[in-house]
Every structure is written in structure tokens, then in C-alpha cells.
Curated annotation (Swiss-Prot):
Cross-referenced Pfam families: Ribosomal_L21p (PF00829)
Listed HAMAP family: Ribosomal_bL21 (MF_01363)
InterPro entries membership: bL21-like, bL21-like_sf, Ribosomal_bL21, Ribosomal_bL21_CS
Species this protein is from: Clostridium botulinum (strain Langeland / NCTC 10281 / Type F)
Function, in words: This protein binds to 23S rRNA in the presence of protein L20.
Self-association state and partner proteins as the record states: Part of the 50S ribosomal subunit. Contacts protein L20.
Assigned keywords, A-Z: Ribonucleoprotein, Ribosomal protein, RNA-binding, rRNA-binding
Entry protein name: Large ribosomal subunit protein bL21
Family affiliation: Belongs to the bacterial ribosomal protein bL21 family.
Gene Ontology biological-process entries: translation
GO cellular component, one term: cytoplasm
Domain of life: Bacteria
Molecular function GO labels: rRNA binding; structural constituent of ribosome
Length: 104
């Protein structure tokens, strides 16, 4: 069984046991979160349930494995011949989750 869920403005195709990195969730490590924005559920018998826009009564349960920050991305702007240089770094926060159960 698999599902397509929406979290952090992005869509993820998930199955039970998958580990993925999503945009930061406000949850503690080793706690469980419920993702109830489910767009699609594919069952083992080949049946697919598509939501309009969400599947009614479907939710995905996941365990929070870690909270962290991604590698630094360096943004460097400059204007030639004008002595203008600007260096900026950004580290995007993320949450590492493991999918435990898909309820549909």
C-alpha cells in the first residue's frame, strides 16, 4: 500500500517503512505525527482511491526520527567593476520521519 501526502507545501509518495526528509514539523524526536492531507491511496489489490482534493478518512502515521538542518547553501552576489560583493549562507531546517502506518 502506498499514499501521496502533502506536507510543507510538497507532495511525497510514501509506503510503510519509508524514511524521508520533510520540511520542519513542530514535533519532538521519538513522537508520532499524523499526516492527514492524503491526496491518493494505492491499495495492494490494484485499486486506487483519488481524493477530491483529499481522501476522506485517510491518514498516515509517522514517527519523528530526528530534527536537523541541511547542508549550507552559499549565495554570492557581486557586481563587476563596482566593488559590490555580498555572501550569504542558508541552512534549511528539516524533520526526518519514518512512515509507520497508512490508514485508508
Amino acid at each position: 500500500m502506498y499514499a501521496v501526502v502533502v506536507t510543507g507545501g510538497k507532495q511525497y509518495k510514501v509506503a510503510e517503512g519509508d524514511v524521508l526528509f520533510v520540511e520542519k514539523l513542530t514535533a519532538d524526536v521519538d513522537s508520532t505525527v499524523e499526516l492527514d492531507n492524503v491526496l491518493l491511496v494505492g491499495k495492494d489489490n490494484g485499486e486506487t482511491v483519488v481524493g477530491k482534493p483529499m481522501v476522506e478518512g485517510a491518514k498516515v502515521t509517522a514517527k519523528v526520527l530526528a530534527q536537523g538542518k541541511a547542508k549550507k547553501v552559499v549565495v554570492f552576489k557581486y557586481k563587476p567593476k563596482k566593488d559590490y560583493r555580498k555572501k550569504q549562507g542558508h541552512r534549511q531546517p528539516y524533520t526526518k520521519i519514518q512512515i509507520e502506518k497508512i490508514n485508508a
